[in-house]
Amino acid sequence: MNKVHKPLYFYLMLFFSTTIIGALLLYLPFTGKKPISFLDALFIASSAFTVTGLSPVDIGSQFNILGEIVILLLIQIGGLGIVTVTLLTLVFLNRKISMKNRFLIMVTWNIDEPGGVIKLIKHLAIYSLVTELIGMICLCLSFIPKFGIGKGLFLSLFTSVSAFNNAGFALFKNNLIDYSSDPIVIITISILIIFGGIGHFVVIDFINCKKLSKLSLHSKLVLTTTSILIIIGAITFFLLEQFNTMQHMGLVEKIGNSFFQSVTTRTAGFNSIDIASINKSTALMLMLLMFIGGAPLSAAGGIKITTFAVAFIFVLNYIRKENNVSVFNKEISDKHIKLSIVTINISFLFISIITFILSIINPNISLIKLLFEVVSAFGTVGLSMNLITEYHGITKIIIIFVMLCGKVGLLTLLRTFIPPKSPKNYRYTKGQIYL
């Protein structure tokens, strides 16, 4: 077994064992207000640990405070990454971090060099906890007057952690629909989602950089693409839904909720409107945003905005017949271009196959609704068109598999189980293919 496969196997073992432990805790009677099947407990644990947000039951009425704390911890560990939490524990105990463990972080976060790995996870932990604390304080302004100090504090903490880690779990029966007119909740959660979705690397780079022109290429690409997608998504959602799901709202409220849904759709999965009632055209737009997802080195899922941006720039440059693929006066390497194209293709193929299988198992459900659920699970978003309560046992197992694949990454899984070929010392002559 080569040096790449050993960390991958260990990472997957940590990942699956944590999910199983979480499921067992949620299944036990002392964490719930009423009995729950183990499959539903496994589904919720998987959804929390992959920071997706899908749930076959209302977690607010299903679980007591202990169960909600278990879900909260799964979200936090899943957002930071189980490997990151493990190594942070070793750092806290003043234990030496071996090269094997450093390589494990590199594999987990797709980092090319081992240098600065410990500094990276320290910054990640501090950034996450500080941002979540600030978000909690802001949400307290709305929740404490409504629920009192004790419950208000916990709701603020849970919602802040869920938002920053792009999980989309809420302890309210209708998610955030009842708070669609509350500016404190909508704005705070939107900011938390954005900060969680762009990653700490970009934020630290932005803070340390005195001029925007001096930002790293990664930060420029993440910030630019994120801004464009949020604006386009908000405008499109407003135009498509202003006379549908938002017809009862005023103009300012429509704009605010359009912005919120554009932000949350790519990564988090909170909803301030009824997703089951949106137009088909809106559903297609939301699926595209969920497929793209957030930034690398963050809690967000999807193919990642940098992958989308690089592929888009490559196609644009190819149409223009430009020899080099470049952006912001920097050339993009062939390695990253190939990786982006491969990621998009295998993700599209995976989603298509899973949707095809689910359409056979659930012949009475429309294809667009099934596709929406699969894309949401794969992008670890958590938006649902209210189909989740209708899932059969086999459908739940498939969706769990999709969530895990979306969180771990298809390429990571394929590299784990498909051994690499030895490099060849020769090359074949080029052949002609007509396209």
What are these regions (language model features)?
Residues 1-435:
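Membrane-proximal intracellular helices of multi-pass ion channels
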